[in-house]
Amino acid sequence: MKIIILGAGQVGGTLAENLVGENNDITVVDTNGERLRTLQDKFDLRVVQGHGSHPRVLREAGADDADMLVAVTSSDETNMVACQVAYSLFNTPNRIARIRSPDYVRDADKLFHSDAVPIDHLIAPEQLVIDNIYRLIEYPGALQVVNFAEGKVSLAVVKAYYGGPLIGNALSTMREHMPHIDTRVAAIFRHDRPIRPQGSTIVEAGDEVFFIAASQHIRAVMSELQRLEKPYKRIMLVGGGNIGAGLARRLEKDYSVKLIERNQQRAAELAEKLQNTIVFFGDASDQELLAEEHIDQVDLFIAVTNDDEANIMSAMLAKRMGAKKVMVLIQRRAYVDLVQGSVIDIAISPQQATISALLSHVRKADIVGVSSLRRGVAEAIEAVAHGDESTSRVVGRVIDEIKLPPGTIIGAVVRGNDVMIANDNLRIEQGDHVIMFLTDKKFITDVERLFQPSPFFL
């Protein structure tokens, strides 16, 4: 597939890294020549220096015969105009744009379609982050929760702790503890190394366990791996930007929410707009302010400013002063590895959320959901099975007969409204949504090939 990526920042560069090794012809466009040279030194791709919305630049990038344009520059307006130019001048069939501003996202249905601004798929990073954080608030103790099949199935990542009934026992004993609940442990990471789970695998404290279950059973499975935490009640947010304000708006009906904003004018605006959130003007690294607002009674402290260092430092201070759990938004990928699991309980990467959303639209075969996991090393995907026994490598076959790539596990199959946790004898049918987990994303091309019907596959 011939793909043009506009923007060589963290998202554009990471997307190129994900796609360049999958038999794609990638061209990256950016105004920053140094960024482009860095990418070209690392990967086998073309680069074009220039403004991504200019017709001349797009023509030079190969828009005449491109299959897809992905606009992820730092400017919403550039991304929108680029999609319009690609549609009007080059008839590029697939156009994806990252749009940050809530003003545009709010009216997306009216703004973005072929008769207006021709964007096929809109990626709204701030909304993705809000959704991710909200899911983690719904499941205290989870490190990550990803929904598939319109929310019917979830993949959850939890750390195993002493106190969980399964610790020190084989995975096969889970059925004895939960006879009426089906789940599939897709992977276990122990000391950062993947273990392919078997029934005889002993779960150890400290293991990072990835499991798939019907969404309504997630809490029950979590209770096998750790003592369930009490639901959060008191939440303190730091940062009143798009993410902080959007999160407060979503939480304030069900939780006691306080928000700290260091810009006085912005704090005043939020105090007027938010109905049940208490807004403070101040600095979250101010110990006196935190003490006055009873940080020791806060169940969850969430720092979502656009400053990584400020988020990390304020969260560390809050934890030291008694906040039960702290979560931070981190832009730099290197920081995520450094802080998660130390004093910081959970680090959220907006880039990772954006990449996951983008990959679900650029994967081959009928891939309808993608989640990039463990800082991009692993991947969970939702693929739709098409064809019949003569044209498909999966349709009409039981799971045990399917030649899955190394490190790939089928976790669940959704058929209509029915969720079926995978077992060796489950037969895949036309139209099934198949949820898979890959401990190594380098095999994603092999998985895509499995789900591409072909009369010549034999």
UniProtKB/Swiss-Prot annotation:
Taxonomic source organism: Escherichia coli (strain K12)
InterPro entries the UniProt entry points to: K_uptake_TrkA (IPR006036), NAD(P)-bd_dom_sf (IPR036291), RCK_C (IPR006037), RCK_C_sf (IPR036721), RCK_N (IPR003148), Trk_Ktr_HKT_K-transport (IPR050721)
Name of the protein this chain belongs to: Trk system potassium uptake protein TrkA
GO terms for biological process, alphabetical: potassium ion transmembrane transport; potassium ion transport
Lineage: Bacteria, Pseudomonadati, Pseudomonadota, Gammaproteobacteria, Enterobacterales
UniProt keyword Cytoplasm, yes or no: no
Entry GO CC: cytoplasmic side of plasma membrane; cytosol
Keyword GTP-binding: no
Ranges for domain RCK N-terminal: 1-123, 232-348
Pfam families (alphabetical): TrkA_C, TrkA_N
Molecular functions per Gene Ontology: NAD binding; potassium ion transmembrane transporter activity
Described function: Part of the constitutive potassium transport systems TrkG and TrkH. May regulate the transport activity of TrkG and TrkH systems. Binds to NAD(+) and NADH.
Highest taxon above the source species: Bacteria
Membrane topology: Peripheral membrane protein
